């Protein structure tokens, strides 16, 4: 007898023939067409306006035309749509006071795994290994429609090349993770999406991998993909100019300090001399040494850099939830989970998040003042724009 998946010897002709194709595939289940799901779960005009405005603002910040910061903040991953809406309501209520920040809620439904584990709401929405992907896609799309209709733009990690067909029209900013930044498939995907994309440095700490990904994705590509009707097709893209680096640290240590930011900016400038060297810093992952309690420490360093006028810093990522920490799914399943606590990476709680964003908003104002004073002292503005106030070519936030 042969163990499962082991090829039988050629002399066992009938058994051998069965192992020529799909030898390790258990079966196929139909997947809903993207066009059908979009028809059934429709975004409102208000949601579409929120999405488009956030895309435009994020692109301007990345290009250096708006002096605010893009802030990607929210749970490490979404495992409860109800809790995600509760978090979004907190975020929406507080957003107006952070006029120096473009707040985009982290709404990740797919999780890359270093080893094995829960792969996210789309893959396993019931958290029980039943892999009801059609249900997961519907839940994810409905949640993004609800969040954006509330006035909260959303961010998504692009983990595969198919799920964006179901969700990309609702997204204002996307990320390519450390494990996939070097992947040609993901670079091709990023070249065709309609929103800004950040590339994380590699798991080994290499920033050049992210810089190369930016350069690749900003150019046109042709590749095999899937249409909204679910048909295989040749996809031809124009290239995405709204791309940037995300510093997330690595197994070798953090890379959020000023010298790391400037080194990354120099690498971007060398590769794309005509573009603003936009750098986003991830307060979690390698930069926090995988301890969510270190995220405020990382943010303090970012604030110090902003306060002295650093213009390459254009964004921040924070893993935040209603309550702090993380938890594993207990044997009894979702019913045994603590409310508002991540089931993947640890997150800071809402109260800590507010303190962090208050500090960050103040640091943006300090940077704005530093730059304005420098420009006025030197008698020119070089056409630098910030959000809202215009002074001889310099637009700053608030007064016109």
Residue ranges, per PLM feature:
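Asparagine/serine/threonine-enriched low-complexity, disordered tracts
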Residues: 378-382, 387, 392, 397
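Conserved, mostly hydrophobic/aromatic
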Residues: 74, 281, 349
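Gly-rich Lys/Arg/Thr-decorated short loops/hinges at beta-loop-alpha junctions or inter-strand turns
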Residues: 34-42, 71, 237-251, 337
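Internal helix-turn-beta structural module
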Residues: 321-371
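Conserved phosphate/anionic-ligand binding catalytic regions in large, soluble enzymes, centered on
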Residues: 70-83, 285, 345
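Active-site-facing alpha/beta catalytic cores
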Residues: 2-5, 16-20, 88, 94, ...
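Glycine-rich phosphate/diphosphate-binding loops that line cofactor/substrate pockets in enzymes
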Residues: 59-68, 270-275
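N- or domain-start disorder-to-order transition segments that initiate the globular core
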Residues: 7, 18-65
